[in-house]
Amino acid sequence: MDVCMALIEGITNCAQLGEPDIVIEEIFEKMDAKKEVFPKLDAVTPPATILATNTSTLDVNEIASATKRPEKVIGTHFFSPAHVMRLLETVRGAKTSDQTIATVMKLARRLGKAGVLVGICDGFVGNRMYHHYTRQASFLLEEGATPEQVDRVIYDFGFAMGPFSVGDIAGLDVSWRIRRRRAETRPQDERYSPIAD
């Protein structure tokens, strides 16, 4: 562990990045914030550096548009907790190059992840399914079940953990931001449970 920790260096200024092969951005799930960070990364890293965003739902094309190298911008969605969860969604933007994709998929294998190439859609693969799963779980709470009961049934069904445990690990603020963003386009007639809000 000491050897691994010695390889990690914290910085507070993008200009301190040096000349990395890849930068994986990990800030909160808000488009304005990501579009503020990516031009800075673009300005201080060599043109060959891959700029990856660890977004769980946001449009990689919009993030890439904030740079001068959209062919080097890609999504790398690590699921929480990243040291346990094997899935790594590799999100191809409209202009992401084949070489960028190949490099990130190779990195996924080196990290022991199950890399899955996905396109642009709200929630990609994992969170697209998780959205419906948690929606139904919230309805169960409204009908009288407890979070522990719902999680236990899901666990007994064969999942690694239930939706409420996932929310606790990933951060309730993350799912709250996603719900707020999706509220703008949610059909009026779609049943919504405000219980998590």
Regions found by a protein language model. Give the residues of each.
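N-terminal glycine-rich phosphate-binding loop for ADP-containing cofactors
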Residues: M1-D197
